[in-house]
């Protein structure tokens, strides 16, 4: 029986790059890894409202960390005259005890980002909008983007308060999960309702890419 895997991890080194870019010996590896997790959790928890899709981390030296934030609302993170981003940098330096540089990259196509689409569906469901309506509207908006070739959405849980949990999905366009050169964006989100938690999964196909055009440059 086939096993389902995260399409992003399956394509690492082929069409996608790693979100953490650094090298370390055995003694420092665990320390750096946990530090990366702390940084990402801190940013996503405190700046969730800014529509954060991804946080990439680079280490130029043992005492310097570069944090790249991909967000749909860059202005909220930067703030007036850079006040917010300066405050964020100070908090991260206190958290890590190292010199931190924060770089913000705004996502231009919000409907082409799987994380933002999944979180949008979850937010609508939590506002008591019917899950089918939220799902079909998200698919319709995404397919209007010229960068999106196909999208698949699956929602699982006690749909409409049913006693038995089930899954429903919808797909439009082409989503070739078995093609490794296919640029597949994938995300998972959770909607908390009065009947329990609903899981939302989103796959977005951006077309086939060559290894020389890997996402994010070098891994």
From Swiss-Prot:
Question: Family per UniProt?
Answer: Belongs to the universal ribosomal protein uS3 family.
Tell me the protein's name: Small ribosomal subunit protein uS3
Q: How does it assemble?
A: Part of the 30S ribosomal subunit. Forms a tight complex with proteins S10 and S14.
Q: Does the keyword RNA-binding apply?
A: yes
Q: Which organism is it from?
A: Fusobacterium nucleatum subsp. nucleatum (strain ATCC 25586 / DSM 15643 / BCRC 10681 / CIP 101130 / JCM 8532 / KCTC 2640 / LMG 13131 / VPI 4355)
Gene Ontology molecular-function annotations = mRNA binding; rRNA binding; structural constituent of ribosome
Q: Which GO terms describe its biological process?
A: translation
Keyword Transmembrane helix set for record: no
* Purpose of the protein: Binds the lower part of the 30S subunit head. Binds mRNA in the 70S ribosome, positioning it for translation.
Q: Where is the KH type-2 domain?
A: 39-108
Q: Name one GO cellular component term.
A: cytosolic small ribosomal subunit
Q: Which SUPFAM superfamilies match?
A: Prokaryotic type KH domain (KH-domain type II) (SSF54814), Ribosomal protein S3 C-terminal domain (SSF54821)
For this protein, the record's InterPro entries field holds: KH_dom, KH_dom-like_a/b, KH_dom_type_2, KH_sf_prok-type, Ribosomal_S3_C_sf, Ribosomal_uS3_bac-typ, Ribosomal_uS3_C, Ribosomal_uS3_CS
Q: Which UniProt keywords apply?
A: Ribonucleoprotein, Ribosomal protein, RNA-binding, rRNA-binding
| CDD domains in the record | KH-II_30S_S3
């Amino acid at each position: 029986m086939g096993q389902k895997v995260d399409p992003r991890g399956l394509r690492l080194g082929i069409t996608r790059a790693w979100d953490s870019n650094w090298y370390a010996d055995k003694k420092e590896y665990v320390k750096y890894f946990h530090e990366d997790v702390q940084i990402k959790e801190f940013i996503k928890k405190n700046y969730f409202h800014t529509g954060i899709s991804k946080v990439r981390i680079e280490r130029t030296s043992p005492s310097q960390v570069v944090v790249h934030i991909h967000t749909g609302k860059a202005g909220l993170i930067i703030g007036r005259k850079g006040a917010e981003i300066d405050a964020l940098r100070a908090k991260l330096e206190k958290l890590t005890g190292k010199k931190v540089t924060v770089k913000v990259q705004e996502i231009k196509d919000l409907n082409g980002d799987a994380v933002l689409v999944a979180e949008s569906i979850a937010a609508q469901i939590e506002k008591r909008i019917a899950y089918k309506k939220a799902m079909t509207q998200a698919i319709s908006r995404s397919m209007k983007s010229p960068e999106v070739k196909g999208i698949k959405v699956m929602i699982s849980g006690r749909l409409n308060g049913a006693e038995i949990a089930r899954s429903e999905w919808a797909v439009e366009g082409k989503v070739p999960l078995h093609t490794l050169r296919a640029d597949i964006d994938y995300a998972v989100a959770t909607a908390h309702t009065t009947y329990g938690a609903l899981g939302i999964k989103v796959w977005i196909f951006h077309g086939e890419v060559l290894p020389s055009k890997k996402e994010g440059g070098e891994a």
